[in-house]
A protein has these predicted regions:
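Alpha-helical interaction segments
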Residues: 1, 19, 121-122, 185
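Alpha-helical transmembrane spans
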Residues: 125, 130-135
């Protein structure tokens, strides 16, 4: 049951970039399908001196008649030094027997990465696909942290839209996000809709699952601005 296989390939160019840190250094989200919470995303930020570690955990479980029909788990740790992305370690466990151990690090002006396709030598300016970092919307290519591959992306800015979180109305920037499909993907990469607060924090994203045509929404649950 591939309900969320591509749900979170979830959350700089070489120029310096500083993205927002949430209150209490944590952003948490509910993952919702058919009006039911089926999982969570938690991103924590550990900022010490010039080093920032961003840890993201995705935990999804779908039950049908009290029986687990689908599970997905992913974790990743990004390391940034002086506002530059230099390292990542990750793990993704899919609903079938697929699992990937992801690594990447800047070495000698090359980003050496490994994942589904083995070892890759990439431009050191590559960014990880973490929707929290709005800077990814300016890129042409990103590093997929779920499978350890490169995807080309295309982003379209839409009209700002008012959304509601925790009974608060927020005027958010809205974008469409598309990425190329890899030959080993089980299905097409879905089109994502992303909403960001004016301070650039990620508030919400959604997509339509290609297999069952159901909408999956991920929305911030600890927003208190």
């Amino acid at each position: 049951m591939k309900i969320i296989t591509v749900l979170i390939i979830y959350f700089l160019s070489f120029t310096v970039h500083s993205f927002p840190l949430p209150k209490e250094n944590k952003a948490t989200y509910d993952v919702i399908r058919k009006n039911k919470v089926i999982g969570s995303i938690e991103t924590t930020f550990n900022n010490e001196d010039s080093t920032l570690e961003i840890t993201t955990v995705v935990d999804i479980e779908v039950k049908v008649l009290f029986v687990t029909a689908y599970e997905f788990y992913q974790t990743s740790i990004e390391t940034w030094v002086d506002n530059e992305f230099i390292k990542i370690e990750g793990y993704a466990d899919f609903e079938d027997e697929r699992e990937y151990f992801i690594k990447g690090e800047d070495i000698d002006n090359i980003f050496l990465a490994s994942g589904m396709d083995g070892e890759l030598k990439l431009d050191k300016s590559i960014l990880p696909l973490n929707y929290w970092n709005k800077e990814i919307l300016k890129q042409n290519k990103i590093f997929d942290t779920q499978k350890g591959i490169v995807r080309e992306i295309q982003v379209t800015k839409l009209k700002d839209e008012e959304i509601e979180i925790n009974d608060k109305k927020i005027l958010a920037e809205k974008y469409l996000f598309n990425a190329t499909t890899h030959p080993k993907d089980k299905g097409p990469f879905p089109e994502y809709t992303l909403w960001y607060a004016k301070n650039e924090e990620l508030l919400k994203f959604r997509f339509i699952n290609w297999k069952d045509k159901k909408e999956v929404i991920t929305i911030r649950n600890n927003w208190d601005q």
